[in-house]
UniProtKB/Swiss-Prot annotation:
This protein's name: Small ribosomal subunit protein uS13
GO molecular function, one term: rRNA binding
Gene: rpsM
Record-linked Gene3D superfamilies: 1.10.8.50, 30s ribosomal protein s13, domain 2 (4.10.910.10)
Keywords: Ribonucleoprotein, Ribosomal protein, RNA-binding, rRNA-binding, tRNA-binding
C-alpha cells in the first residue's frame, strides 16, 4: 500500500478512487489533484512510479486534509460555542444546527427517546 498524507491507500483500485480514502478528499478534489500532478486517473495505484507518487504527495500536501482539517472543524465549532451564537448554542445542546424541525424527528442528533414517566392523556 502507498502512504499519502499518513493514510495507506488501496493498491488494487484506480488512483482517483484510492485518493478518496483520505479525509477531506472527495472525487472532484481527487481529480483536481491528479490533474495538477499530471497523473492519469485510470492508473492503478500499484502501477504508479515513485516519481508520480511523489508528485501526488506534494499536491496533496498543499490541501488541508486529515488531522489539520479535523482540527480546524473542531476549532470552528468551539469558537461558535464560545461566542454563544445561535449555531453554537445548538451544538452545545446537541440539537440540529441548520434549521431543521425538532418536534417529531431529529433522533440522530437528539439521541434515543427519553420517555417521561406517568404521563397520562
Amino acid at each position: 500500500m502507498a502512504r499519502i498524507a499518513g493514510i495507506d491507500i488501496p493498491r488494487e483500485k484506480r488512483v482517483v478512487i484510492s485518493l478518496t480514502y483520505i479525509y477531506g478528499v472527495g472525487k472532484s478534489t481527487a481529480a483536481k489533484i491528479l490533474e495538477e500532478a499530471n497523473v492519469s486517473p485510470d492508473t492503478r495505484v500499484k502501477d504508479l512510479t515513485d516519481d508520480e507518487l511523489g508528485r501526488i504527495r506534494e499536491t496533496v500536501d498543499a490541501y488541508k486534509v486529515e488531522g489539520d482539517l479535523r482540527r480546524e472543524q473542531n476549532l470552528n465549532i468551539k469558537r461558535l460555542m464560545e461566542i454563544s451564537s445561535y449555531r453554537g448554542i445548538r451544538h452545545r445542546r446537541g440539537l440540529p444546527v441548520r434549521g431543521q424541525k425538532t418536534k417529531n424527528n431529529a433522533r440522530t442528533r437528539k439521541g434515543p427517546v427519553k420517555t417521561v414517566a406517568n404521563k397520562k392523556k
